[in-house]
């Protein structure tokens, strides 16, 4: 299936998706407990386009599907210089801080938790990252995306 993003066509088949987090919330009712799920998903084509989305539903697969649809609505283009990023950048979102540093070729992706799938799906091959402060998956993903969007060639 193809979608339009700005002036370019987006082919969903060339994108990969990674589920970063699945959360469960419980509502206690007279008959017992009712569960609902939320899913945080990152999609990317390993060529500079990457997006994230949050989906909520009564079943996990439905939440993931909604999150993927949301991720395609939030695609950003990441500026990649060779196999890494152009310069150091630090960004804060709520209580999460993320530090991204360019790395020399052959270093690989040194990232943890929620940051790793984002930089891998963006197509960055060599990068050093450090997550500081809160490790809430949504906040870390949002801080990483905001930082990658601010990188200038």
Swiss-Prot record:
Belongs to the universal ribosomal protein uS5 family. The N-terminal domain interacts with the head of the 30S subunit; the C-terminal domain interacts with the body and contacts protein S4. The interaction surface between S4 and S5 is involved in control of translational fidelity. The keyword Transmembrane helix does not apply. GO terms for cellular component: small ribosomal subunit. SUPFAM superfamilies: dsRNA-binding domain-like, Ribosomal protein S5 domain 2-like. Part of the 30S ribosomal subunit. Contacts proteins S4 and S8. This is Small ribosomal subunit protein uS5. The lineage of its organism: Bacteria, Pseudomonadati, Campylobacterota, Epsilonproteobacteria, Campylobacterales. It comes from the Bacteria. GO terms for molecular function: rRNA binding; structural constituent of ribosome. GO terms for biological process: translation. Residues 15-78 form the S5 DRBM domain. The gene is rpsE. It comes from Helicobacter pylori (strain Shi470). InterPro entries: Ribosomal_Su5_D2-typ_SF, Ribosomal_uS5, Ribosomal_uS5_bac-type, Ribosomal_uS5_C, Ribosomal_uS5_N, Ribosomal_uS5_N_CS, Ribsml_uS5_D2-typ_fold_subgr. With S4 and S12 plays an important role in translational accuracy. Keywords: Ribonucleoprotein, Ribosomal protein, RNA-binding, rRNA-binding. PANTHER family: MITOCHONDRIAL RIBOSOMAL PROTEIN S5.
